[in-house]
C-alpha cells in the first residue's frame, strides 16, 4: 500500500530505536505466521508459545538481518525453527483451533471442524521436517527454493520431504493413492483431499 514503509525499512527502523517499527512488522505478517505456527505444531497452545518465542528471537536478532533474503523468509525461518524446537521437546497433541469465520450452516461448521481436526492429526504424524516442508509449500504456496532457504536444506530435500508427506497424508485422509476413510478426490493437487481447510479458518 502506498505510504507504508517496506519490510526492510521497518527492520532498520527497529534497530535504530523506533519503538513502533517491530510492532508494525509483526502486525503485517501476524496472520500468516500464526497459520504457519499452528499447522507446524498442531495445536493452538504450542503455536502461541512458539510464535511468542520466535518474535522475541526476531526482536533481539534484528540487527543481524543483512537483507540477503526477504524479511518474510527471515521471519518464516525463525517461526519454523521455534516450532521445530518445541516439537523436539514435547510431543504435541492437535486440538481444534478456536475462532475463525462464522458460517451460516451449523452442519457445515461441524463438518469443517471435523476436517480441520483430521488434518491437524494427520500433520502431527509427519516428521517435523516433512511437516514444515509440506505446510510451507502446499498450505502457503511458497516456492520450493524459498522453503529450502527457510529450512536451510537443499531444494531436493524439500521436494523429497513434500513427496513423502503428501503420500502419508493421502493415506491418512483418504486422498489420491490413500485409504478410503474420507473419500479422497483424485483431482486434489496434493495428499490433502479437496475441501479440507488448510487454513484452519474456512
Language-model-detected regions and their locations in the chain:
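Helix-turn-helix DNA-binding module
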Residues: 45, 124-132, 136, 140-157, ...
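Arg/Lys-rich amphipathic alpha helix in sigma70-family domain 2
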Residues: 60-67, 77-98, 111-112, 164
Amino acid at each position: 500500500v502506498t505510504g507504508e514503509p517496506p519490510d526492510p525499512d521497518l527492520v532498520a527502523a527497529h534497530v535504530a530505536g523506533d519503538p513502533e517499527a517491530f510492532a508494525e512488522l509483526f502486525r503485517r505478517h501476524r496472520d500468516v505466521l500464526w497459520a504457519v505456527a499452528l499447522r507446524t505444531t498442531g495445536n493452538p497452545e504450542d503455536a502461541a508459545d512458539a510464535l511468542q518465542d520466535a518474535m522475541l528471537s526476531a526482536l533481539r536478532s534484528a540487527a543481524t538481518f543483512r537483507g540477503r533474503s526477504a524479511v518474510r523468509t527471515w521471519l518464516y525461518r525463525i517461526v519454523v525453527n521455534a516450532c521445530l524446537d518445541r516439537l523436539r521437546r514435547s510431543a504435541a497433541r492437535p486440538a481444534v483451533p478456536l475462532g475463525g469465520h462464522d458460517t451460516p450452516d451449523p452442519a457445515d461448521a461441524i463438518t469443517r471442524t471435523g476436517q480441520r481436526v483430521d488434518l491437524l492429526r494427520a500433520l502431527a504424524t509427519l516428521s517435523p521436517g516433512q511437516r514444515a516442508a509440506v505446510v510451507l509449500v502446499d498450505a502457503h504456496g511458497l516456492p520450493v527454493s524459498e522453503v529450502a532457504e527457510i529450512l536451510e536444506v537443499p531444494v531436493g530435500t524439500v521436494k523429497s520431504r513434500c513427496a513423502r508427506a503428501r503420500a502419508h497424508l493421502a493415506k491418512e485422509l483418504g486422498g489420491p493413492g490413500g485409504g478410503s476413510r474420507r473419500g479422497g478426490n483424485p483431482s486434489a493437487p496434493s495428499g490433502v483431499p479437496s475441501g479440507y481447510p488448510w487454513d484452519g479458518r474456512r
